[in-house]
């Protein structure tokens, strides 16, 4: 119930959905005796849409997240393991269609495949369940394992954590599954804009990981002057 409520709340406060809600409230009020207030609220919603969509604001907000952790540079000994967070795969669509169906964060899985080949002795931990709260057909971890196996990654290298539905649960369920010890090196693979939250959650769980950001959405601070929708 808490998970479902958090998803509904998250949906409502997503900027695009929040702006749409403001506009809708404005339209509804304009049809009542509070017409003037409705017009003002609707106009404010349209103004927010223009500012967020056609100004650099969206890129600036994205950059404040994605630029906190730079691209990983290989140095020192090879990592002992690689943790790949879910969010790249649609497990239910995959179950129906019979082939891995990925979204705009697919780089999480392609990076996992590249790292698996670069570091052949590293464990690959796939942390991702199914965000469908009603009738989940599969998990991201299961689909991810099949994807990596098809690319030649040995099954005995892959560890599946298929219960997590949030970043907090990624850390909560992964740490006791692999029991990391002091001195081990673990890479954490997720989207660049998601990395600050992921690193914070894993560190809070007592799991010392190294950031391996992927799925970059900007070219860097040069995009701070570029309209968000261009």
Please describe what each predicted stretch is.
Residues 1-30:
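Membrane-embedded alpha-helical segments of integral membrane proteins
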Residues 7, 39-42:
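Residue-level signature of transmembrane alpha-helical entry/exit and packing/kink sites
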Residues 12-14, 36-37, 171, 178:
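Hydrophobic transmembrane signal anchors and adjacent membrane-proximal interface regions, especially
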Residues 14, 18, 34, 63, ...:
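Short helix-loop boundary/capping segments at the starts of domains
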Residues 22, 41, 45-48:
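Hydrophobic alpha-helical transmembrane segments of polytopic
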Residues 30-38:
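Membrane-interface helix-boundary motifs at transmembrane edges
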Residues 46, 51-229:
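A structural signal for short, hydrophobic/glycine-enriched beta-strand patches
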């Amino acid at each position: 119930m808490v998970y479902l409520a958090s998803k509904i709340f998250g949906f409502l406060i997503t900027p695009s959905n929040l702006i749409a809600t403001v506009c809708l409230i404005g339209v509804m009020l304009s049809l009542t005796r509070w017409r003037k207030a409705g017009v003002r609220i609707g106009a404010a919603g349209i103004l927010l849409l223009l500012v967020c969509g056609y100004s650099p604001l969206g890129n600036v907000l994205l950059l404040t997240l994605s630029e906190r952790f730079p691209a990983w540079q290989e140095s020192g000994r090879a990592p002992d393991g690689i943790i790949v967070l879910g969010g790249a795969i649609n497990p239910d669509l995959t179950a129906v269609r019979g082939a891995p169906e990925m979204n705009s964060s697919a780089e999480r899985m392609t990076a996992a495949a590249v790292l698996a080949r670069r570091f052949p002795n590293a464990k690959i931990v796939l942390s991702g369940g199914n965000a469908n709260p009603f009738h989940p057909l599969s998990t991201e971890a299961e689909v991810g394992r099949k994807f990596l196996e098809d690319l030649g990654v040995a099954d005995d290298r892959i560890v599946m954590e298929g219960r997590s539905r949030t970043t907090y649960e990624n850390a909560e369920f992964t740490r006791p599954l692999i029991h990391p010890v002091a001195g081990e090196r673990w890479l954490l693979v997720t989207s660049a804009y998601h990395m600050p939250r992921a690193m914070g959650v894993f560190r809070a769980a007592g799991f010392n990981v190294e950031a391996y950001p992927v799925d970059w959405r900007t070219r860097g601070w040069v995009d701070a002057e570029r309209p968000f929708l261009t």
